[in-house]
Amino acid sequence: KTSMTDIAHQLAISTSTVIRKLNDFRFKHDFSRLPKIMSWDEYAFTKGKMSFIAQDFDNLNIITVLEGRTQAIIRNHFLRYNRAVRCQVKIITMDMFSPYYDLAKQLFPCAKIVLDRFHIVQHLSRAMSRVRVQIINQFERKSHEYKAIKRYWKLIQQDSRKLSDKRFYRPTFRMHLTNKEILDKLLSYSENLKHHYHLYQLLIFHFQNKEPEKFFGLIEDNLKLVHPLFQTIFKTFLKDKEKIINALQLPYSNAKLEATNNLIKLIKRNAFGFRNFENFKKRIFIALNIKKERTKFVLSRS
C-alpha cells in the first residue's frame, strides 16, 4: 500500500533499486488447487477499462488478477486448471453481471452462483429513485409538492423501519413534524408514488428477512401493475431467481472482495496510477498475498 518512493526512503535505498527489485519479483500460480468458495469482481485499472479479480472467500488470498474481464480472457485463465480441480469449487459469489453467469457454470460445473445482496437491494433502490424523479417532474417546479418531494426525497428511499420519530420544525411545511408524518404528506401527493413506495418497502422487508417465496410472489403479482422501470428490474430478478434465492439462503456475499477492491484503489492512488499492468499486479499480490509475521513481544527479566 506504500508508494515506492516511501519504501526507498524507509530502507535508505534508491527508488530505482525498489523498482528493480519489483521487476525481479515473481509469483508462481498454483494450478493444482482452487478454493471451495471463490469471489469474482472487477475493478478499474485505467480509465474506461475494467479488469477481473478472483479471491479466496475464506483466507482472502488473491487467486488471480487479469488485465481484462472479457469471457475469453477469464476462460483461458481458468482452463489452465484441470477439470477435477475446477469441480472442487462449490460456491462463486459475484455482482449482478450476466456475462459471468454462463461462463461460471461452464468452467465450474459443480458451483452454485450467489449474487451479492447489496447489489440486489441497490437495483431496487435505483428503480425507486428513477420512478420518484419521473413522478416529481409531473408537478410544477414552483409548486409546494415539487419542493417538498425534492427536499425530503431521502425519506422515500430510506427503510421505513429506520425513520426517526423525533419532531422538529420543518420550514417547508411551517410546522413541527416527525419524518413519518412528512413521508405521509409526500405520499399523499401522488397515488402512483404511494403504490410504488409501499411495494418497494415490502420487497426490502421480505428480502432482508430472507423470505424468497414472499419476495418473488410479490414480484410476480405486481409485474404488470408497475412502472416500466420496475418491470425491467422484476424481469431481471425472475431470470436470476435461482441465484437470488442462493443469496438469501447462503451466508456468502461479495463484501470481502469489495473491501479488497478498496485496498487496490489505495495502492493505485498512492502510486498515482500504473502504466504497466504487470507491476500493478505484483503490487497487489505483495500487499495482499504475503502475510506479515506478527512480532512476538518478549518481556525482559529484571
Regions from the PLM with identified roles:
Residues S3, A12, N23, F27, ...:
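Non-catalytic alpha-helical coupling and interface elements of nucleotide-dependent molecular machines
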Residues T15, I62, A111-K112:
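Secondary-structure boundary/capping signal
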Residues K1-M38, E42-K49, R86-V89, T93, ...:
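Short, positively charged, Gly/Tyr-enriched micro-motifs
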Residues I120-R141:
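Short alpha-helix plus adjacent loop in nuclease-associated cores
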Residues S32-D58, I62, R69-R80:
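Mobile-element integrase/transposase regions
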Residues K47-G48, F52, D58, E67, ...:
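Acidic/histidine-rich catalytic cores and adjacent linkers
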